[in-house]
């Protein structure tokens, strides 16, 4: 069913093809566009289907030839009435127009000329003009070009004073509708032709200084003045008519087909603008339909681009071109994220602004399975997104080609394009500031990151700190604005496994930053290095730096400087650690001028910094560099802290672990000369000669010391505890047990200077052999064993041992590395196992019966299941945790239970950790600490 739409606001220069182009993609049948004109610039469009009409109504508010149009629903009846009304208005206006030379001397026009009845006379003369008349009128026109009554040769035998009526386009437009009835009306009397001699008196007009022979005189005073002889003389403005624009001048040309006596009908509506119902001369129409008569406006480059949002991630360039089917797409650029995947946005470039305008009408339409948004874009966005501009011949509004725009060079000198830009600090330049560069980044990596962009030679600057390592900052300068904008679009893209931040910066700002970095390097002079030299001349061993942890993630340099108020610190010496995403790690590094200032900072340990207790640890310059190079998630992972009282022992690696320094002699069976006990004494005392199976020694420590039984694969934080192969012979004893005389040294507190717990009073040799079998619990362990004295042997088979000592596999290969062997077997200054520099502590959980407290175990509960050993060490950072003692618990299925065991060097240290850190979070869960 055909639907009619009424269009208002149509400009004068628009034609039917412009309307059809406005409704491109919709079905308009042939002859379905009717332009009425009028004051509102109206037109009627007939659509073939309701759907086309509905889609057409959605385009209301659009522009045709720069004029905004409004669409209204209409009907065929209204359309026909408006067309008929327009025709009548044209006819009435044409017949009421007075002749242009009505005020000239001569016989007045006949009163019948204002009526339609005199038209047949003139129309009949159109088809059979007299050659003499045509020649005469033409010659008159040649001599009087300013007189519009002789502006056409098609007047026939009509009097000259009627030329204005016949020569106007409005009059000619009524000929097709009036010629048919005119032939039936008898011609009225016509004024005689001899009235023509009334024209010669015109040259005698006194106000005109032109000599009389010149025929180009202006009209008489009542007629408005005419400009001096143009190529096509314009008509005198006519009285205003309702809704009619100014008329075009009459053509001056030979008679067209249809007027030369051939009798062929004249089709005035053929390829003409219907707003005027056909111009006067079909050969030279009013050239409004031809774009060649209208000078094309310069095209704004921004009018060629649109931005598309919300596309499916799987959309390709062909999908975008299919979406804009029917439009001339020049190029498509799909935007991508930092990984290189489509992000659902894109930019499209068209060949003409009309295509862009039509593309904007497809906003909120379906592409594949998603409704996309189409919005205007600019050439700057296109260039910034990485699109290329090719200055080829651009298409004008109607398809004409225009030469490319003239691009002026930056410099008038011949080499201006080849040399780099001036390095004046006052010049803005095209510079970028890079942050987050890998520490091993070089110029070639930066060039590869900005590949295909024109970088100024030797303009890449990578900043280095006082330690000689890259700080992650850099600067790059580009040659032109397009490459500069393209570089800014690579913000947060990856270089290797780190994403780079690209920020704009002026050349002056870049030079200031580079100068600041160089001054920082100069301040780190050799004099300052000498200040922190220790007596041995080691630069890195002096503790002139502080590592501040457990601070808010949003901490800033100013907060740290306020926290260190009273201690002289340079602002450039404070470094807040951030991760790869630029987020704070809750840590800061401070480098002081001397060790005294660093010691002063230790007084701030556990002081409040923005609501949190800050942990301040003094570290060496080497440690600070290590922390700065590999910033941990929290604290410094793997930072080895010196443990008081646990020095490295020659021949015993890993600070107290039994090693190759343990002799193979002195075992039962080989005799114990140092104790004076025969080798058979141990067997007679109740020790099994075939060894002690692991099941024979109960684990009195229970689950609390179960970490001693886990394998090194599960602990994964310490070396396996293996006795030397020659220690136990051919596995004759399995896990070796120290001789009875050494019991106090082996199972009591074996620290240097601590006497044994034997009854004889001799250090290390006070245990009687008979008392070993049935003594009054004189070998019972300390209270830390499991809540009370234990029998260390009331007969064969009941020999007790330290908790967990015998629960491991033979050789104690899985025990933590801090569990030492008998002290008498290691080197020492004296012959006995008494005081000496060897520190072989007992297993964690051992408490001493006297003197310094021994290692203590803490049970950590309610941790996240994904927690790692490093995170636990970070949690206890600052406390003296025994290296390699952290053990995660797993259930029978191998799944984590959220619990762990941690051993500390002393009970005081463990107690402080429980008091300070209980109910503190690890991740999103608050952990519980239970003292062993």
From Swiss-Prot:
Compositional bias (Polar residues): 392-401, 408-417
Comp. bias intervals (Gly residues): 783-811
Annotated Pro residues bias: 824-836
Keywords: Disease variant, Nucleus, Phosphoprotein, Repeat, RNA-binding, Schizophrenia
UniProt record, GO biological process: regulation of RNA splicing
Location in the cell: Nucleus
Disease: Schizophrenia 19: A complex, multifactorial psychotic disorder or group of disorders characterized by disturbances in the form and content of thought (e.g. delusions, hallucinations), in mood (e.g. inappropriate affect), in sense of self and relationship to the external world (e.g. loss of ego boundaries, withdrawal), and in behavior (e.g bizarre or apparently purposeless behavior). Although it affects emotions, it is distinguished from mood disorders in which such disturbances are primary.
Record protein name field: RNA-binding protein 12
Species of origin: Homo sapiens (Human)
Source species taxonomy: Eukaryota, Metazoa, Chordata, Craniata, Vertebrata
């Amino acid at each position: 069913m055909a639907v009619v739409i009424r269009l208002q606001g149509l400009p004068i220069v628009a034609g039917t093809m412009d309307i059809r182009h406005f409704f491109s993609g919709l079905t308009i049948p042939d002859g379905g566009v009717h332009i009425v004109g009028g004051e509102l610039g109206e037109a009627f469009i007939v659509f073939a289907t309701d759907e086309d009409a509905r889609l057409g109504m959605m385009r209301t508010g659009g522009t045709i030839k720069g004029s905004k149009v409004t669409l209204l629903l209409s009907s065929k009846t209204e359309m026909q009435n408006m067309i008929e009304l327009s025709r009548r208005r044209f006819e009435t206006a044409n017949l009421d127009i007075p002749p242009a030379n009505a005020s000239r001397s001569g016989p007045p026009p006949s009163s019948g000329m204002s009526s339609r009845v005199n038209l047949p006379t003139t129309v009949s003369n159109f088809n059979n003009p007299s050659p003499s008349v045509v020649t005469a009128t033409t010659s008159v026109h040649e001599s009087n070009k300013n007189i519009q009554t002789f502006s056409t040769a098609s007047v026939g035998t009509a009097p000259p004073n009627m030329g204005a009526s016949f020569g106007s386009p409005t009059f000619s437009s009524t000929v097709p509708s009036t010629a048919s009835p005119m032939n039936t009306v008898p011609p009225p009397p016509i004024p005689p032709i001899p009235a023509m001699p009334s024209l010669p008196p015109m040259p005698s007009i006194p106000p005109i200084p032109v000599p009389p022979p010149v025929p180009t005189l202006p009209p008489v005073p009542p007629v408005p003045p005419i400009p001096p002889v143009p190529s096509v003389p314009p008509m005198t403005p006519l009285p205003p008519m309702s809704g009619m624009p100014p008329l075009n001048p009459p053509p001056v040309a030979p008679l067209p087909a249809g007027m030369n006596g051939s009798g062929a009908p004249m089709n005035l509506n053929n390829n003409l603008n219907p707003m005027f119902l056909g111009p006067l001369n079909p050969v030279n129409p009013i050239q409004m339909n031809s774009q060649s008569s209208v000078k094309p406006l310069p095209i704004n480059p921004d009018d060629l681009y649109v931005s598309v949002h919300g596309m499916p991630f799987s959309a390709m360039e062909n999908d975008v071109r299919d979406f804009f089917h029917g439009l001339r797409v020049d190029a498509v650029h799909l935007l991508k994220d930092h990984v290189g995947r489509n992000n659902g946005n894109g930019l499209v470039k068209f060949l003409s602004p009309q295509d862009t305008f039509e593309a904007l009408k497809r906003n909120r339409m379906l592409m594949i399975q998603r409704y996309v948004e189409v919005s205007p874009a600019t050439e700057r966005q296109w260039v910034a997104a990485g699109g290329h501009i090719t200055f080829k011949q651009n298409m004008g509004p109607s398809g004409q080609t225009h030469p490319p725009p003239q691009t002026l060079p930056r410099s008038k000198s011949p080499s201006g394009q080849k040399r780099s830009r001036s390095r004046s600090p006052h010049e803005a330049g095209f510079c970028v500031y890079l942050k987050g560069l890998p520490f091993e980044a070089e110029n070639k990596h930066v060039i590869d990151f900005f590949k295909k962009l024109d970088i100024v030679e030797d303009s890449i600057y990578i900043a280095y700190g006082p330690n000689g390592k890259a700080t992650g900052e850099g600067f790059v300068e580009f040659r032109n604005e397009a490459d500069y904008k393209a570089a800014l679009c690579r913000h947060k893209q990856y270089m290797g496994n780190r994403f780079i931040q690209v920020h704009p910066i002026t050349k002056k700002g870049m030079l200031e930053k580079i100068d600041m970095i160089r001054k920082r390097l100069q301040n780190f002079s050799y004099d300052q290095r000498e200040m922190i030299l220790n007596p041995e001349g080691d630069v890195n061993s002096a503790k002139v730096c502080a590592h501040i942890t457990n601070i808010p993630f949003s901490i800033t340099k100013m907060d740290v400087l306020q926290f260190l108020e009273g201690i002289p610190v340079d602002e450039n010496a404070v470094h807040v650690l951030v991760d790869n995403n630029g987020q704070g790690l809750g840590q800061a590094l401070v480098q002081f001028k001397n060790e005294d200032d660093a010691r002063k900072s230790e007084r701030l340990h556990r002081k409040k910094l923005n609501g949190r207790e800050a942990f301040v640890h003094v570290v060496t310059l080497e440690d600070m560099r290590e922390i700065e190079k590999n910033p941990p998630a929290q604290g410094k992972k793997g930072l080895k802290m010196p443990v008081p009282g646990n020095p490295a022992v020659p021949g015993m690696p890993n600070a107290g672990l039994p090693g190759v320094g343990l002799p193979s002699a002195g075992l039962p069976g080989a005799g114990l000369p140092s104790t004076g006990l025969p080798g058979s004494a141990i067997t007679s005392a109740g020790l099994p000669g075939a060894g002690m199976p692991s099941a024979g020694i109960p684990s009195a420590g229970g689950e609390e010391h179960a970490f001693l039984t886990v394998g090194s694969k599960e602990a994964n934080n310490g070396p396996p505890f293996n006795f030397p192969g020659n220690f136990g012979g051919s596995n004759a004893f399995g896990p070796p047990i120290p001789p009875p005389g050494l019991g106090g040294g082996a199972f009591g507190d074996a620290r240097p200077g601590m006497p044994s717990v034997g009854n004889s009073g001799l250090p290390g040799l006070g245990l009687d052999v008979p008392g070993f079998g049935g003594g009054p619990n004189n070998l019972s362990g300390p209270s830390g064993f499991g809540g009370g004295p234990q029998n260390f042997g009331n007969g064969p088979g009941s020999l007790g041992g330290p908790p967990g000592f015998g629960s491991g596999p033979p050789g104690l290969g899985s025990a933590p590395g801090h569990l030492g062997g008998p002290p008498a077997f290691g080197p020492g200054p004296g012959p006995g196992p008494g005081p000496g520099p060897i520190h072989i502590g007992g297993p964690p959980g051992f408490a001493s019966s006297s003197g310094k407290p021994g290692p203590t175990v803490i049970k950590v509960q309610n941790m996240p299941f994904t927690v790692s050993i490093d995170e636990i060490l970070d949690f206890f950072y600052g406390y003296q945790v025994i290296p390699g003692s952290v053990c995660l618990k797993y259930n029978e299925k191998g799944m984590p239970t959220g619990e762990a065991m941690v051993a500390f060097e002393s009970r005081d240290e463990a107690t402080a950790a429980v008091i300070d850190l209980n109910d503190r979070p690890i991740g999103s869960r608050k952990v519980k600490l239970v003292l062993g």
